Amino acid sequence: MESREDSFISKEKKSTMKKEKQAIASQRNRRRVIKNRGNGKRLIASLSQRKRRRIPRGRGNEKAVFAPSSLPNDVVEEIFLRLPVKAIIQLKSLSKQWRSTIESRSFEERHLKIVERSRVDFPQVMVMSEEYSLKGSKGNQPRPDTDIGFSTICLESASILSSTLITFPQGFQHRIYASESCDGLFCIHSLKTQAIYVVNPATRWFRQLPPARFQILMQKLYPTQDTWIDIKPVVCYTAFVKANDYKLVWLYNSDASNPNLGVTKCEVFDFRANAWRYLTCTPSYRIFPDQVPAATNGSIYWFTEPYNGEIKVVALDIHTETFRVLPKINPAIASSDPDHIDMCTLDNGLCMSKRESDTLVQEIWRLKSSEDSWEKVYTIDLLSCSSSSLSEFRDGFNWTRKDLVEPSTPVAICKDKKILLSHRYARNMIKYDPQIKSISLIYQPPLCRRYASYFQSLISHI
């Protein structure tokens, strides 16, 4: 017969084996397969990347102690660099060393290069919108307009990849203007208040900037709601670019009644000095005020007001901070009414478009690298789209109105050559297929303020 001692040893062995199996199962459960959205590869990584060892603290009392990962640091970094921004941010709380690595500028720059390459295969759009003024309010009182929603949309699937709501310290009085994306960052400001921010929606980081002199002047001239209604068109949009450092550029027309002030003024924000400065040499042409400047290939571009019946394009070299006038623009653009034309960046190239008032056909031209000639790349014919495809839009905006002189704004080009379109008066965003001449609804948020081509990044604390 089995003695009591043998029975006790047998039970202890079984208990030990059971604990070992549980430990192995627990270790396997801690390892997860994280799918990188950027390149579609499956990366096996541990959320903690640490080995657990136990140090005995007396009989029957053990304390769990974490030891660093056995993987080399450079291997761990390469894994982290290919994870989505949200996953990387979560890893910061697991290790002081990882937090230091992830928050370093070198890591942010390396991650930026990877996501820039992946944007071709996985194009995305950022949608910025206000919250309804009474949503979540107390006592039916309007909530302050300090909340802005940011939603990232996948162009191919039209699905929402992420959404976040950021509350800013100072409100915008429902006059929100946003720049194009620069390395995943946006500049958001208002002319009715002195609010101006640089924000990274992916990391939720933002920085409030001192108001530009132009903002201060506008608030002095138009301090109330009544006076703002009578305001003449002004330049509402900044350009957010990166040379050696990040820059905000604000070009606007001077007071036409005072010729001693010059024709235009240009303010540039220096992030290191935390201050605005004037450029001494500015264009001798007044720029068309109601436009969004386009930035690509190291330059920022603006339309001018018509001179002798002809529109010109001025450009600022963001490295040398010098202005130039393009030698030639498309004749159809040059002789147009400024309200009928638009400028944008598509596939890293400067593009211009014009909408014909009688046919509503909109043609898009791209500037060649020599800057002396243009090529037609797309034609948008919304009137030829079937009425059934147009009837699905319920926001009250008619994309084929004959009296709508402003053209649609191309936001991005999908991999299947479909064109993503927005309009300053529309809340929704549509996708136009030039092959079969059809349109489909992509996204319709409430109180949308801006659509912009976008990719997530870790760049913060600039």
UniProtKB/Swiss-Prot annotation:
Residues 65-110 form the F-box domain. PROSITE patterns: FBOX (PS50181). Residues 28-40 have a biased composition (Basic residues). PANTHER family: BNACNNG10540D PROTEIN, F-BOX PROTEIN CPR30-LIKE. NCBIfam families: F_box_assoc_1. Residues 1-59 are annotated as: Disordered. This is Putative F-box protein At1g12855. Residues 1-22 have a biased composition (Basic and acidic residues). It holds the Pfam family F-box. InterPro entries: F-box-assoc_interact_dom (IPR017451), F-box-like_dom_sf (IPR036047), F-box_dom (IPR001810), Gal_Oxase/kelch_b-propeller (IPR011043), Kelch-typ_b-propeller (IPR015915), KIB1-4_b-propeller (IPR005174), SCF_F-box_component (IPR050796).
